Amino acid sequence: MVKVYAPASSANMSVGFDVLGAAVTPVDGALLGDVVTVEAAETFSLNNLGRFADKLPSEPRENIVYQCWERFCQELGKQIPVAMTLEKNMPIGSGLGSSACSVVAALMAMNEHCGKPLNDTRLLALMGELEGRISGSIHYDNVAPCFLGGMQLMIEENDIISQQVPGFDEWLWVLAYPGIKVSTAEARAILPAQYRRQDCIAHGRHLAGFIHACYSRQPELAAKLMKDVIAEPYRERLLPGFRQARQAVAEIGAVASGISGSGPTLFALCDKPETAQRVADWLGKNYLQNQEGFVHICRLDTAGARVLEN
């Protein structure tokens, strides 16, 4: 039996639309991510468990884990009879890389079960392909950090899909999921087809400056440059209370904040534990909309997807 855990991730990080993402893990030790188990069997089967299992498609072939198994078998050129179990701990359409968690855990578990026939680069390419079936286009800003850990910059040149960017140990990521769903496809459709020249220049300056600040170890500068002129101005209308929440967490002391992925999760970066707790308390009282919402104080998950049992 192989059991793989794949962590939540926060894509875009305001400054890097479709090209930056970070894997995150709660500081209290909770597992914020999906778990997939693979066991040898006579025929294929898929069982769904976990807090958000009831939100998965009722038709097994529509489940992304089934599609991962099917695509992995196609890649190897043979049918691999296994019993798979998806522990769905991540809310769907949350902006926390929910589909990426399932895809990464499923493909990594299949690869481990079969003796690692695929290298990490090929496996990551498959992960991007499968995640793209849900989001509507292939992009790696969730699957890459989820699989490899840390903060990842998408390269997609010279057979390099992504490379790690150094993060800051003092940064605490407060993630607030309000309990509502935002479709990634819908959040992409709301974006303009073309952008003004000054917005393109600002975006390039912010992203280049952010990467420079990470490598030159300037956390204050990095946080200041986490600005979004590409998606947030258009997507915030999909997120009730987002603008007020951003203003509130800034007043409390967050050094940066924005939309995690395509939302509705809000992320707020803090450089002090007491500030992070105050931000988390405010968001828990004011940004959550129902019982399914949650707030976690997290750090970067530098390990990425990992085998829990083998």
Curated annotation (Swiss-Prot):
GO terms for biological process: threonine biosynthetic process. Pathway: Amino-acid biosynthesis; L-threonine biosynthesis; L-threonine from L-aspartate: step 4/5. It holds the Pfam family GHMP_kinases_C. It is found in: Cytoplasm. Its main location: cytoplasm. Belongs to the GHMP kinase family. Homoserine kinase subfamily. PANTHER family: HOMOSERINE KINASE (PTHR20861:SF1), HOMOSERINE/4-DIPHOSPHOCYTIDYL-2-C-METHYL-D-ERYTHRITOL KINASE (PTHR20861). This is Homoserine kinase. The gene is thrB.
